[in-house]
């Protein structure tokens, strides 16, 4: 306890420290844990030569139609300010179980935003290699897609990829040192 106090650590219950000394695996969520939690859209990869809509206007209207505050949505909102010009007639909010969200707009079809492998039903191999390269480099890639169908919580039969949005979140300056400490202490690290 005295050693920890010297390192400006408050010990409220000693048994917690004893339990922590037996930890041999630490599971971490990358976003906001080893990153700074300052996600931004760093690149836009067009996926079609003839998009069905102006990307800025579509994603801006999408942001304006949904009320969400997760890190990805906030980063998209910074890059594509909410415009709300298009009239939304149906919304499917994001859920971590579904991994996508959508807004159906009057006279414009549905804009879908989510995980490429989910929106494309496992056919993400159809995407250009640059998408997989960005994912392999640790970036989050979000697919913007379009469907002529009205969407109410179930993926439509036809989803047309429009663009891949590459999001980056800077690594915390002390992350390397922290992770190295746990490795030296024989604690397995798992990024979930």
What does each of the following model-derived ranges do?
Residues 1-15, 38-41:
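Juxtamembrane helix-loop transition segments at the membrane interface in multi-pass membrane proteins
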Residues 16-161, 167, 180-191:
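Cytosolic catalytic regions of ATP/NTP-dependent phosphoryl-transfer enzymes
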Residues 171-180:
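The conserved cystathionine-beta-synthase
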């Amino acid at each position: 306890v005295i050693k920890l106090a010297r390192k400006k650590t408050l010990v409220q219950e000693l048994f917690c420290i004893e339990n922590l000394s037996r930890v041999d695996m630490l599971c971490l969520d990358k976003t906001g844990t080893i990153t700074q939690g300052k996600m931004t859209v760093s690149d836009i990869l067009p996926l079609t030569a003839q998009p069905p809509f102006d990307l800025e206007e579509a994603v801006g209207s999408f942001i304006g139609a949904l009320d969400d505050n997760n890190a990805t949505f906030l980063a998209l909102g910074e890059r594509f300010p909410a415009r709300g010009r298009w009239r939304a007639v149906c919304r499917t909010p994001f859920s971590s179980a579904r991994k996508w969200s959508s807004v159906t707009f009057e006279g414009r079809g549905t804009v879908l935003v989510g995980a490429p492998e989910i929106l494309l039903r496992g056919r993400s191999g159809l995407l250009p290699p640059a998408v997989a390269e960005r994912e392999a480099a640790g970036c989050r890639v979000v697919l913007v897609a379009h469907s002529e169908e009205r969407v109410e919580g179930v993926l439509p039969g036809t989803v047309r990829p429009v663009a891949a949005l590459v999001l980056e979140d800077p690594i915390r300056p002390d992350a390397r040192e922290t992770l190295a400490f746990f490795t030296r202490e024989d604690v397995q690290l798992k990024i979930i």
